[in-house]
Amino acid sequence: MHPGKRLVGKVAIVTGGASGIGAETARVFALHGAKVLLTDSNAALGKSVASEISDSGGTAAFATQDVCDEASWATIVTQAEENHGRLDILCNIAGISGRDPKMNIQTSVTTAGPRLTEQTLEQWNRVMAVNATGVFLGTKAAIPAMRRAGGGSIINISSICGIIGSHANAAYHASKGAVRIFSKAAAIQFAPDRIRVNSIHPGFVDTPMTRPGHSNPEVARLRLEATPLGRFGTPADIAAGCLYLASDEASWVTGSELVIDGGMTAN
């Protein structure tokens, strides 16, 4: 993406900023003039992304964060305001699949995570904590700062799994469905404050989280066959949607769900 001015003067927090969609969104926001505070639990990768942005002429800083920790959110929002005087954009991207990290390859389309009767309460709670509670805590923390700034944009990354079901991983579906409807509720509540809240629903995107599945040729083939445009999405595809919703071009867009899935859910 070429440099632009769509976010000049704006300050953004991007969670999950160390890799994949989060890292690309942080880069794109900075490329369009935003001052970016990116957060992640992976400090080494996060600092590397922030340094890359700064070395390219952008403005970025990194902070280690567990999005499930409410106190960390107060610290992050305060840091953004103290460093740059305001907060305009929050992009909640941090998320987990809930798959067993020891599985380095997905064996079939039905093993994208445990089936419902095999899913433990611990697994359920962890997925919901990161994917849903983290979004709630971030939104709650950002609202007062955005009110002080005269408005803002909150972008919550859900998934096509928040719209449709599948053979496995009910916790992931439930968490992403929660993000979808939570975003609509927040949009209605804070529209009078000129705070817009929208969700983005990626399809099969090539990221570190999806590579265990895509490493299996059969899984990759079936997913591509289910995608009318015939390719996996890239982090840049999703970052472009985040850029639009963060910009003033989307000033009349709130409570919406932006599906970026190569046509899969229309098929």
Q: Can you name each region flagged by the protein language model?
A:
Residues 5-37, 186:
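Canonical Rossmann dinucleotide-binding motif of NAD(H)/NADP(H)-dependent dehydrogenases/reductases
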Residues 139, 175, 183:
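Active-site helix of classical SDR
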Residues 144, 188-189, 251:
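Alpha-helical segment proximal to the catalytic Tyr-Lys
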Residues 159:
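Residue(s) in the substrate-gating loop at a strand-loop-helix junction
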Residues 191, 196, 253-255:
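Short, small/polar-rich loop/turn modules that mediate ligand/substrate recognition or access, typified
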